[in-house]
Amino acid sequence: MGDEVWYATIVGVIVLSGLSIFYILYLAKMRRTKTNAAWKQAATELGLDFTPVTRIFGKYRMSGVIGKQLSCSVWAYTKPNSQGGYTTVMNYDVRFPQRLNNVKELLTPNIQSKLLEVNNVLKKVVVSDDSVNSIGMHGFIRESEILVQNVKLLIQLAELIIPNEEVDSIFEEI
């Protein structure tokens, strides 16, 4: 009688383990489906291209040109951290149509105020001669409204920096 109980216990543990794994994979698939939908909606609203992620740990990315002027990319990926786990990182990059010389001279008080506003939302905002970006933000955004808001903030900042004769409010187009 003891062998049957042992056998039934082993089979029960194996079945429960299998069901648990399938349930976790199912939850991961549902989460990926919702995230793909949110990123697709944000990309459509911004006029960017997005290819849905099909793998469980795939890299999310949307990119394109806004108003024929600014090249815009948003991407997220998972990387190992120092504690042996993984961290998800969000990156935003808006590139100017052409390289600006000495962009620091273009930072008027109005632009500095906008830079502070953007930095309060995105953190780690960097303005260079060829782009405005926020690279390495920890966490992952799954809501389309927040993705759109963050990209629009960077676009607004980039529009303020570009000399006026180069842009006719491309922000109005989106």
Language-model segment annotations:
Residues 32-69, 73-174:
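Charged, low-complexity intrinsically disordered regions
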Residues 1-36:
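N-terminal signal-anchor transmembrane alpha helix of single-pass membrane proteins
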